[in-house]
């Protein structure tokens, strides 16, 4: 059985799910609209579910999401909040540090603290509500720090389903970042839809750009993405994630089985690519 890494899973405890999807009215509306499971689980229950579905490792971000319409923070999770739910399972659960460019150098220093003191394995960016594109120079100090720390940055790329400007995450914007920071490992999440071909082109061109499949069910993946991840140039450039509660493990894994991927491509999609990019040891 192929091992699985979920490179992006939202905080899962009842307290943090409430903070994310009930306390904030906009995200609460999304949860109702999509019928999301937001009951939450204890860390012990979560690990039991991981074992049940063959999930070896999960990465959880300290989400930093700003409301574009209200100009207030929707999600502003803290390093310690995520560390407290992952600390007892250091080989199974890992943190990603959320980027808020408005924190300026305090934010850069907090990124370093999260990695060096709490063992976080990367950074995480959701730029849409801030109203600036991913290649805005205000993000460059954070990207430079990621290079210095040798950790990847995960960023949502493609449209935004919320009331936020989707153009902030056009895949072609990654060209600027990858050219300026050729050592920065970039995980472009959410398949880049509806600009999947544009994101594939960026991943094909740049050795340091990877594609993440979060928030889009495998049976709906763009046919060009499926072809890319199943061929020589794309094997090792695409990784699996759920963005739970948007997607869940059993449904996704069944749909991936139904794609009929080559064994090497399937192993890299589910485990190998994320293991390499985030340097996750067995």
Where are these regions (language model features)?
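Short aromatic-enriched loop/helix-cap "lid" or pocket-rim segments at secondary-structure transitions
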Residues: 15-20, 70-73, 108-110, 165-167, ...
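Short beta-strand segments
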Residues: 6, 57-62, 98, 187-189, ...
């Amino acid at each position: 059985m192929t091992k699985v890494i979920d490179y992006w899973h939202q905080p899962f405890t009842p307290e943090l799910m409430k903070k994310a999807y009930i306390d904030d009215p906009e995200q609460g509306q999304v949860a109702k609209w999509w019928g999301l499971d937001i009951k939450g689980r204890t860390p012990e229950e979560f690990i039991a579910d991981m074992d049940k579905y063959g999930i070896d490792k999960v990465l959880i971000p300290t989400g930093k999401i700003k409301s574009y319409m209200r100009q207030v923070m929707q999600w502003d999770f803290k390093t310690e909040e995520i560390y407290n739910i992952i600390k007892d399972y250091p080989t199974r659960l890992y943190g990603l540090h959320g980027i808020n460019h408005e924190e300026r150098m305090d934010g850069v220093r907090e990124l370093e603290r999260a990695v060096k003191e709490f063992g976080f394995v990367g950074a995480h960016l959701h730029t849409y509500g801030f109203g600036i594109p991913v290649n805005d120079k205000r993000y460059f100090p954070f990207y430079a720090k990621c290079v210095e720390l040798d950790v990847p940055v995960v960023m949502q790329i493609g449209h935004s389903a919320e009331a936020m400007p989707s153009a902030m995450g056009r895949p072609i914007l990654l060209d600027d970042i990858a050219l300026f920071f050729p050592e920065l490992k970039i995980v472009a999440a959410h398949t880049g839809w509806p600009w999947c071909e544009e994101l594939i082109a960026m991943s094909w061109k740049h050795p340091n750009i990877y594609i993440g499949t979060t928030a889009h069910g495998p049976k709906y993946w763009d046919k060009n993405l499926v072809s890319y991840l199943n061929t020589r140039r794309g094997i090792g450039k695409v990784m699996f994630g759920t963005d739970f509660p948007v997607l869940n493990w059993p449904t996704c894994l069944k749909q991936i089985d139904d794609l009929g991927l080559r064994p090497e491509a399937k192993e890299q999609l589910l485990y190998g690519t994320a293991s390499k990019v985030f340097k996750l040891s067995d």
